[in-house]
Curated annotation (Swiss-Prot):
The lineage of its organism: Eukaryota, Metazoa, Chordata, Craniata, Vertebrata. Belongs to the intercrine alpha (chemokine CxC) family. GO terms for molecular function: chemoattractant activity; chemokine activity; CXCR chemokine receptor binding; CXCR3 chemokine receptor binding; heparin binding. Monomer, dimer, and tetramer. Interacts with CXCR3 (via N-terminus). Keywords: Chemotaxis, Citrullination, Cytokine, Disulfide bond, Inflammatory response, Secreted, Signal. GO terms for cellular component: external side of plasma membrane; extracellular space. Coiled coil: none annotated. Pro-inflammatory cytokine that is involved in a wide variety of processes such as chemotaxis, differentiation, and activation of peripheral immune cells, regulation of cell growth, apoptosis and modulation of angiostatic effects. Plays thereby an important role during viral infections by stimulating the activation and migration of immune cells to the infected sites. It is found in: Secreted. GO terms for biological process: adenylate cyclase-activating G protein-coupled receptor signaling pathway; antiviral innate immune response; cellular response to interleukin-17; cellular response to lipopolysaccharide; cellular response to virus; chemokine-mediated signaling pathway; chemotaxis; endothelial cell activation. This is C-X-C motif chemokine 10. The keyword Aminoacyl-tRNA synthetase does not apply.
């Protein structure tokens, strides 16, 4: 094979390998989903993980203050939807307002 043929082969190989992910993790974080409610005061952290190629569903993971336990919550639950609305409402109230300087 001559040099130009080899270079074309390398370029084709590079373009084909560009879309290959480095990680092959194709699992969801949540195996079991709790349908129960969660007291907002007992939450340390609430993570909302959108659906992706590695997991086709939205995942909501609650970390509890007292023991650090992580619970997967049902994103379709009315209680959890209301909890997310309340948290978003609090965030908009807490966000700093910009002032116009004179």
């Amino acid at each position: 094979m001559n040099k130009s043929g080899f270079l074309i082969f390398c370029l084709i190989l590079l373009t084909l390998s560009q879309g290959v992910p480095l990680s092959r993790n194709t699992r969801c974080s949540c195996i079991e989903i709790s349908n129960g409610s969660v007291n907002p005061r007992s939450l340390e952290k609430l993570e909302v993980i959108p659906a992706s190629q590695s997991c086709p569903r939205v995942e909501i993971i609650a970390t509890m203050k007292k023991n650090g336990e992580k619970r997967c919550l049902n994103p379709e639950s009315k209680t959890i939807k209301n909890l997310l609305k309340a948290i978003n409402k609090q965030r908009t109230k807490r966000s700093p307002r910009t002032r116009k300087e004179a």
